[in-house]
Amino acid sequence: MTKQELEKKLAAYRSELRKMGVVSLAVFGSVARNDSTQQSDIDLLVDFDRDIGLFYLFEIQHRLEEIIGVSKIDLIQKGALHPALKEQILSEAVNVA
């Protein structure tokens, strides 16, 4: 999947995502670098307008898998990035919703 395909799929659901508390959603990793393959997962970085629990994060991940039409999403909260990886992830992250 390309960044453009991902943006197109998410565009129709921006309002729903905002109602669910999603402030921003960015892709990073192979999809952001345009070197993904059929086996690649989709790495998404999410930021919420409120504190959420782990079960809610899984609920959002499941909904995104439905919207995008894949079952290979890694969803991580922006505030939970490991310090050793944070700079690299943020430098390649591309906002998609």
Feature names for model-found ranges:
Residues L45-D49:
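Short hydrophobic/aromatic beta-strand micro-patches
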